[in-house]
Amino acid sequence: MAVQKSKKSRARRGMRRSHDAISGPSLTVDQTSGETHRRHHVTADGYYKGVQVISK
């Protein structure tokens, strides 16, 4: 089992964790309907990059 040589300080722990924050989903506005949706995902009405890919 690995055992550390010396205790890591709170500052070092914080520096290691500085990149662990979760960012929110990236959103974009659809060209045709103006609807907000997640990037690289089909909108609720079936459009992707301004083209209808799913018909309802």
UniProtKB/Swiss-Prot annotation:
GO biological process: translation
Transmembrane annotation, as ranges: none
An annotated GO cellular component: large ribosomal subunit
Alphabetic keyword roster: Ribonucleoprotein, Ribosomal protein
InterPro entries from the UniProt entry: Ribosomal_bL32 (IPR002677), Ribosomal_bL32_bact (IPR044957), Ribosomal_zn-bd (IPR011332)
Compositional bias of kind Basic residues: 1-16
The organism's place on the tree of life at top rank: Bacteria
Single GO MF descriptor: structural constituent of ribosome
Keyword Amino-acid biosynthesis annotated: no
Chain intervals for the UniProt region annotation (Disordered): 1-56
Compositionally skewed regions (Polar residues) per UniProt: 25-34
Family: Belongs to the bacterial ribosomal protein bL32 family.
Cross-referenced NCBIfam families: rpmF_bact
PANTHER family: 50S RIBOSOMAL PROTEIN L32, LARGE RIBOSOMAL SUBUNIT PROTEIN BL32
Name assigned to this protein: Large ribosomal subunit protein bL32
Originating species: Pseudoalteromonas translucida (strain TAC 125)
